[in-house]
């Protein structure tokens, strides 16, 4: 199985590293526009093999998409962060151009690949990749919910003082600090609702911490996080390549699900060899429905900036 990761920065390289040492794919290609950068990252990862015991072939390439041919999954991490003085529309315009070009190039060489979008604003870039390429909706997946849910489980773990892997919890909605919806009502520890252990006040703080989880790390690190994002992408890729059919919150195209249409937004999905195998219909209460509708409106508003690109 072959995975291409476009963008050899911190998130892309971490994703390649995790995929390699976990043996998720037999081959990983890192591609970047910066001369020699992906090659260096790939060589560094390969030199871990004797210490970590993996056999994955990792290679790097500078902007040569022919080397990505035959990829089962392509991960797009390319894009720029928002800079001081830059409007939301300007950021979307620049990153949309990058994502569109990358998606078109990889599809020339891997027409049946499944594309995982990581670039921000993630829901809008996922929608752009879908609309610009015409790829079937099950093969375009935005990663955001996997990361947001991981952060939610981590904060619940800290509040409960219990292992995160014993906690089930999910975040739906847009991948943004005002649009995501941590489903505290449905979170559980070894099958027992966390509401049995944590007060409403604590749960509200956990939800709030989750929503600003990315911003918190940016404040501490001085740049965006990369370990958890890279691992979240690898987790998603693993479910695709090995047909694990895990339930993962992902940004996908909805057509009536949860009362929404013509947007990509985070919803619970079954992820397998065909990409999005199924969108699960979780019964939301009235408050959660209202929050989801508000989140969808915000995502739709972001998508408006794509109109000039998608004509």
Curated annotation (Swiss-Prot):
- GO molecular function: any one? L-lactate dehydrogenase activity
CDD domains tied to this protein: LDH-like_MDH (cd01339)
Activity regulation: the record says: Strongly inhibited by iodoacetic acid and CuCl(2). Completely inhibited by N-ethylmaleimide and HgCl(2).
Entry's InterPro entries? L-lactate/malate_DH, Lactate/malate_DH_C, Lactate/malate_DH_N, Lactate_DH/Glyco_Ohase_4_C, Malate_DH_type3, NAD(P)-bd_dom_sf
Which of the seven top EC classes does this enzyme belong to? Answer: oxidoreductase
Among Gene3D superfamilies, the record links this protein to: Lactate dehydrogenase/glycoside hydrolase, family 4, C-terminal (3.90.110.10), NAD(P)-binding Rossmann-like Domain (3.40.50.720)
Q: Which UniProt keywords apply?
A: NAD, Oxidoreductase, Tricarboxylic acid cycle
* Active-site feature positions: 175
Pfam families for the chain: Ldh_1_C (PF02866), Ldh_1_N (PF00056)
pH dependence, entry free text = Optimum pH is 10.5 for malate oxidation and 8.0 for oxaloacetate reduction.
User: Which positions does UniProt annotate for substrate binding?
Assistant: 82, 88, 120, 151
Q: Does the keyword Phosphoprotein apply?
A: no
Q: Which GO terms describe its biological process?
A: lactate metabolic process; tricarboxylic acid cycle
Known catalytic reactions? (S)-malate + NAD(+) = oxaloacetate + NADH + H(+)
The EC number of this protein is: 1.1.1.37
Give the temperature dependence. Optimum temperature is 40 degrees Celsius.
Identify the residues that bind NAD(+): 7-12, 32, 95, 118-120
Q: What does this protein do?
A: Catalyzes the reversible oxidation of malate to oxaloacetate. Can use both NAD and NADP for malate oxidation, but NADPH cannot be used for oxaloacetate reduction.
Quaternary structure and interacting proteins, as annotated = Homotetramer.
Family, per entry: Belongs to the LDH/MDH superfamily. MDH type 3 family.
Which HAMAP family does the UniProt entry name for this protein?
A: Malate_dehydrog_3
Identification of the protein by name: Malate dehydrogenase
Q: Which organism is it from?
A: Flavobacterium frigidimaris
């Amino acid at each position: 199985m072959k995975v291409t990761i476009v963008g050899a920065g911190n998130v892309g390289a971490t994703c390649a590293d995790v995929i390699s040492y976990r043996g998720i794919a037999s081959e990983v290609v890192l591609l970047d526009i910066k001369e020699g950068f992906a090659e260096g990252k790939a060589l560094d990862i390969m030199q871990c093999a004797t210490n970590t015991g993996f056999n994955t072939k990792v290679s790097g390439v500078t902007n040569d998409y022919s080397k990505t041919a035959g990829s089962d999954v392509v991960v797009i991490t390319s894009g720029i962060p928002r800079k001081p003085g830059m409007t939301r529309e300007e950021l979307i315009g620049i990153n949309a151009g990058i994502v569109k070009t990358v998606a078109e190039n990889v599809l020339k060489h891997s027409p049946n690949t499944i594309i995982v979008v990581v670039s921000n604003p993630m829901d809008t870039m996922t929608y752009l990749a879908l609309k610009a390429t015409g790829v079937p909706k099950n093969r375009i997946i935005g990663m955001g919910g996997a990361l947001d849910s991981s952060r939610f489980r981590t904060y619940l773990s800290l509040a409960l003082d219990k292992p995160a892997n014993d906690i089930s919890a999910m975040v739906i909605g847009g991948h943004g600090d005002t649009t995501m919806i941590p489903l505290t009502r449905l979170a559980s520890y070894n099958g027992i609702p966390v509401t049995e252990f944590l007060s409403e006040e604590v749960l509200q703080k956990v939800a709030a911490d989750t929503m600003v989880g990315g911003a918190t790390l940016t404040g501490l690190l001085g740049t965006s996080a990369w370990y958890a994002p890279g691992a979240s992408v690898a987790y998603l890729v693993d479910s695709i390549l090995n047909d694990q059919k895990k339930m993962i919150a992902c940004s996908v195209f909805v057509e009536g699900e949860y009362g929404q249409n013509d947007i990509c937004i985070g919803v619970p999905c079954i992820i397998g060899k065909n990409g999005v195998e199924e969108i699960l219909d979780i019964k939301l209460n009235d408050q959660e429905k209202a929050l989801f509708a508000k989140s969808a409106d915000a995502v739709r508003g972001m998508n408006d900036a794509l109109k000039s690109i998608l004509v």
